[in-house]
Each structure stands twice: as C-alpha cells, then as structure tokens.
C-alpha cells in the first residue's frame, strides 16, 4: 500500500479528519495555559499593591499616630489601554473558561472522528453528550481513558465550566470579587456565586484553574 492509498483509506474511513480536532484541542489548552499564567500574574500584582498600601497605613499610624486608608485604583496596561486590574482579571478568567468550554466541544469531535470512523456522528450532532452516548455502541473500547471520558459530564470541574459559560451566555454576567483584609493583610480573588439547575458554583479564582487545565 502506498502512502497515497493509506491516506485515501484513512480519509474514506473518516479517521484522517481526527487530526485537525486533536491539534485544535492542544491549541486551546495551550491558550488557556497562557491565560492562566496571565491571571496568576494579575492576581499577584493586585495583592502586592494592596499589601504595600495597607502596610503604609500601619507604618504611618505607628510613626505619626494616624494611618489613613485612601480609596485608590489598581490599573494595568493592556497594550496601551489602561484598565482596572479587576476588569483585567475578569477578562482573562472569561478567556480561560471560554477556551475550556470550546475544548470540550472539540474534544468530542476528536473522539467522534478518531474512534467511530465511518459510523461517526455528523459534525453538527457530535456534541459531548451525544458522543458519550454513542460510545456504548463500541464495547471494544474498554480502558480507563474511555471510562474517564464517558464519566466526564459527571465531573465537578466540567460541570463548573459548563454552568459558568451557560450562565454567562444565557442569564447574567458573573463578576470577579476582590477582597482584602486590612488587619491580616491578606487578599482573596473569587468568582461570584451562582446556581444553575440546582448546582451551585463558587470558588477562588486562581487555585482551581490549574486542576481544570
């Protein structure tokens, strides 16, 4: 069999289509990782600036007997545009969640085309749920990867990504909440709590993202 014959066979069996979905999955995760690192730096910058401001309040109080906390803005330069740090955090977080949501859609397309071959679902019908349901028609696929894939919609992290994006798209905007304790000089950046279909969503903005990625 020549290389051309092999390629034709793979294309006829729809397997060759899967490579584009594989590379797209990889690219989306790389972009999400990039945004995650930006989010980490933004949160670090915000907390360092707030720590500096609050420490100065205590230093002034110790030196003069009076320390005053003044309202101020934390800003970052976004390619020549000055924006509030909280807005920047929200922007990057939304990028991450959108990329992860898109990843799962493309991941389903990859499974559909690479494992189902000629029996693959049409692209417009190859949602994650439909692909998982069709997997039962292929009992020869039985390893841990397949088990993890078929259980993915029950995973708490997947549910959060899906619920977050659906809430943003169809219901209302979810905002980042910056909190900084003046006395302990400690900050926390979290996401506004929300509820969808009886499931509640809430966690600190930074630490769970690594697990999601």
Segments from the language model and where they lie:
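Acidic, Ser/Thr/Gly/Pro-rich intrinsically disordered interaction regions
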Residues: 1-98, 108-213
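Active-site hotspot residues in diverse enzymes, especially metal/ion-binding acidic/histidine motifs
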Residues: 103
């Amino acid at each position: 069999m020549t290389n051309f014959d092999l390629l034709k066979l793979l294309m006829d069996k729809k397997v060759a289509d899967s490579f584009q979905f594989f590379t797209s999955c990889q690219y989306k995760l790389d972009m999400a990782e990039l945004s995650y690192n930006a989010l980490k730096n933004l949160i670090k910058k915000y907390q360092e600036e707030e720590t500096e401001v609050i420490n100065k309040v205590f230093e002034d109080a110790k030196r003069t007997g009076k320390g005053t906390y003044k309202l101020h803005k934390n800003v970052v330069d976004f390619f020549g545009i000055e924006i509030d740090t909280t807005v920047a955090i929200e922007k990057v977080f939304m990028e991450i969640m959108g990329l992860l949501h898109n990843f799962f859609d493309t991941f389903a397309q990859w499974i559909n085309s690479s494992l189902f071959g000629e029996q693959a679902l049409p692209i417009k019908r190859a949602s994650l749920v439909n692909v998982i349901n069709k997997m039962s028609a292929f009992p020869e696929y039985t390893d841990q990867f397949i088990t993890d894939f078929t259980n993915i919609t029950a995973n708490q992290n997947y549910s959060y990504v899906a619920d977050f994006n659906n809430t943003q798209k169809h219901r209302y905007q979810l905002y980042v909440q910056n909190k900084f304790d003046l006395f302990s000089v400690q900050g926390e950046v979290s996401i506004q709590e929300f509820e969808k279909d009886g499931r509640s969503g809430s966690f600190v903005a930074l630490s769970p993202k690594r697990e999601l990625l």
